[in-house]
């Protein structure tokens, strides 16, 4: 297995680069972000993943090992080939992909050209548990984190007129639509997200204690 290439950059194109290794030119496909870090005539290093097919062997290059790891995990999804996996990395950085996979955020993947809702749903389904954000706490710790911020958000909402029951239910429903907000655990952001969710439907705003007849 070729883990990385280091040598003089001989060429940088729109989708590939050529690394000169003691007179042998190795061509690698890479994202625009990775290619932008390579400069002709200078030493360059890319982490690589070798894809072997019946009639070809193709190298894909990455800025770091994390990017390569995400690429290879994406390849485990049925229907996702190396070009599509690379396209995902061209649109989103590895951590954003980890967060989207961890929170079940289909919309992140539909932003990638060539990925529709059906494929995005399959990616999220098949990546469940395979990609997690760096520093993600175990489930028990996540529950403990929620226990620390939720009472604060509920208290803020009750001060605005909602009952504790309605406030708690609204928070849960709002964050079900935007799970990445819950993951960050920022109280003001969670409050804004919940109030925005309530404001999207006039009927929801009627849940305030003071507005009941």
From Swiss-Prot:
Keyword DNA-binding among UniProt keywords: yes
Stated family: Belongs to the RuvA family.
GO process terms (BP): DNA recombination; DNA repair
GO cellular component: cytoplasm; Holliday junction helicase complex; Holliday junction resolvase complex
HAMAP family: DNA_HJ_migration_RuvA
Region (Domain II): 64-140
UniProt region (Domain III), positions on chain: 145-213
Oligomer and partners: Homotetramer. Forms an RuvA(8)-RuvB(12)-Holliday junction (HJ) complex. HJ DNA is sandwiched between 2 RuvA tetramers; dsDNA enters through RuvA and exits via RuvB. An RuvB hexamer assembles on each DNA strand where it exits the tetramer. Each RuvB hexamer is contacted by two RuvA subunits (via domain III) on 2 adjacent RuvB subunits; this complex drives branch migration. In the full resolvosome a probable DNA-RuvA(4)-RuvB(12)-RuvC(2) complex forms which resolves the HJ.
Domain of life: Bacteria
The keyword Nucleus appears for this protein: no
Name of the protein in its database record: Holliday junction branch migration complex subunit RuvA
Cell location: Cytoplasm
Originating organism: Pseudarthrobacter chlorophenolicus (strain ATCC 700700 / DSM 12829 / CIP 107037 / JCM 12360 / KCTC 9906 / NCIMB 13794 / A6)
Region feature (Domain I): 1-63
Annotated segments matching region Flexible linker: 140-144
UniProt function note: The RuvA-RuvB-RuvC complex processes Holliday junction (HJ) DNA during genetic recombination and DNA repair, while the RuvA-RuvB complex plays an important role in the rescue of blocked DNA replication forks via replication fork reversal (RFR). RuvA specifically binds to HJ cruciform DNA, conferring on it an open structure. The RuvB hexamer acts as an ATP-dependent pump, pulling dsDNA into and through the RuvAB complex. HJ branch migration allows RuvC to scan DNA until it finds its consensus sequence, where it cleaves and resolves the cruciform DNA.
GO molecular-function terms, A-Z: ATP binding; four-way junction DNA binding; four-way junction helicase activity
Comment text on domains: Has three domains with a flexible linker between the domains II and III and assumes an 'L' shape. Domain III is highly mobile and contacts RuvB.
The gene coding this protein: ruvA
Keywords, ordered alphabetically: Cytoplasm, DNA damage, DNA recombination, DNA repair, DNA-binding
